[in-house]
């Protein structure tokens, strides 16, 4: 079950609307509310991270739907958030058990955001792929996590998983690109 520290994600009329939106996004994430996360995204959103380098539109929301559906013990902590007219930033931590190996993962992530029409139109998350692979995949990840072929394999497997999820997800829970 996801953990939410209500004091950790406060929004306020005194905050810039973009900072409030970032906090709303991560509060939904911590509640395991993929629909709430997707509502923060512009229909033309572009998402990227080391595992999903190019997701457009509904693919981004479906990626979160898939990840939340698979993460039985996810805890999300928003460590920092800021936003203004030029963009936004967040530092957050995900703690979960990697389902394919049963290994615990603590992933420290930095997010950059751009906005259009009061919604997130660009979302780029960055984290150490080697550190993630070392935790998620164990000794193999530690030994090979810095090599491009492992990253390509993880990306391919993730893309295939998302394609399968999108093919099987009910239409009312998917937004098309």
Locate the predicted segments by residue.
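A solvent-exposed, acidic/Ser-Thr-rich amphipathic alpha-helical stretch
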Residues: 34-38, 42-88
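Generic, low-specificity signal for short hydrophobic/alpha-helical stretches with a mild N-terminal bias
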Residues: 7, 19, 42-49, 60-63, ...
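Aromatic side chains
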Residues: 25-29, 41, 47, 52, ...
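A beta-strand edge to alpha-helix "cap/lid" segment located at domain peripheries
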Residues: 9-12, 68-177
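Soluble or luminal CAZymes and related metallo-dependent hydrolases
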Residues: 17, 59, 105
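Hydrophobic pocket/interface hotspot
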Residues: 22-25, 37-38, 45, 60, ...
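Short, low-complexity N-terminal intrinsically disordered segments enriched in polar/charged residues
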Residues: 2-35, 39, 43, 155-177
